[in-house]
Curated annotation (Swiss-Prot):
Name recorded for this polypeptide: Demethylmenaquinone methyltransferase
Classification via Pfam families: Ubie_methyltran
Known function: Methyltransferase required for the conversion of demethylmenaquinol (DMKH2) to menaquinol (MKH2).
NCBIfam families: MenG_heptapren, MenG_MenH_UbiE, PRK00216.1-4, PRK00216.1-5
Organism per entry: Bacillus pumilus (strain SAFR-032)
EC number: 2.1.1.163
Family in the record: Belongs to the class I-like SAM-binding methyltransferase superfamily. MenG/UbiE family.
Domain of life (superkingdom): Bacteria
Annotated keywords: Menaquinone biosynthesis, Methyltransferase, S-adenosyl-L-methionine, Transferase
Molecular function per GO: demethylmenaquinone methyltransferase activity
Substrates-to-products reaction catalysed: a 2-demethylmenaquinol + S-adenosyl-L-methionine = a menaquinol + S-adenosyl-L-homocysteine + H(+)
Binding site for S-adenosyl-L-methionine: 58, 79, 106-107
Length: 234
């Protein structure tokens, strides 16, 4: 019986959670942290704000948001992998982040009221959901008018030569890194599949607009291997 995308992705992250943070650094050559830092500068998160990190995984971006909003702010992190959340909980407790609450839930049906958050983020998670537009619409629903929806994700490089090298890396080399460092060749093969199938920057910007967001902009990183998309709710 063929697994659904949701079932397959859930199985992947339930298995690789222990090595996820290390592997992110290995396969991105530690660039993912720089991409997130640049994204946070673009967001200019305000003290005391309320933020939601969708598909929060091990809570790295959740914690960055908590640092930005400060003690008087509030941050929720949501993920469907309990094992990934367990790693995040350890980080949150050790860091003393009382303003963070991590929740087990589904990005396709966010368990929050309309117009709740000032910022709603998703980092390297949108490519793994069953339906991109449904999740973007949910993120738009729960953000306040004037609030910001932000996606940091792998993208499709457009530079000739660079594009081909990117696909070779994702298809052949990254799964080998998964096998060497995390004993998970099959799981990291899935990650390259999801990255290859993900929309390019212009296509994702169009989905942001279709979800009801305005002033949509995108910002490529490292030759377009990743990009941040930002949209505002009117």
């Amino acid at each position: 019986m063929q697994q659904s995308k949701e079932q397959r992705v859930h199985g992947v992250f339930e298995k690789i959670y222990k090595n996820y943070d290390q592997m992110n650094s290995v396969i991105s050559f530690k660039q993912h942290k720089k991409w997130r830092d640049k994204t946070m500068k673009l967001m200019n998160v305000q003290k005391g704000a309320k933020a939601l990190d969708v598909c929060c995984g091990t809570a790295d971006w959740t914690i960055a948001l908590a640092d930005a909003v400060g003690d008087k702010g509030e941050v929720k992190g949501l993920d469907f992998s309990k094992n990934m959340l367990s790693v995040g909980e350890t980080k949150v407790k050790s860091g003393g982040y009382n303003q963070i609450e991590l929740l087990h839930g589904n990005a396709m049906e966010l368990p929050f009221e309309d117009n709740t958050f000032d910022y709603v983020t998703i980092g390297f998670g949108l490519r793994n959901v069953p339906d991109y537009l449904t999740v973007l619409k949910e993120m738009t629903r729960v953000v306040k008018p004037g609030g910001m929806v932000v996606c940091l994700e792998t993208s499709q490089p457009e530079m000739i030569g660079f594009k081909q090298g990117y696909y070779v890396y994702f298809k052949y080399i990254m799964p080998l890194f998964g096998k060497l460092f995390a004993k998970s060749y099959q799981e990291y093969s899935w990650l390259q599949e999801s990255a290859k199938a993900f929309p390019g920057m212009k296509e994702l910007a169009a989905l942001f607009e279709e979800a009801g967001l305005s002033d949509v902009s995108y910002h490529p990183f490292t030759g377009g291997v990743a990009a941040t998309h930002i949209g505002k709710k009117l």
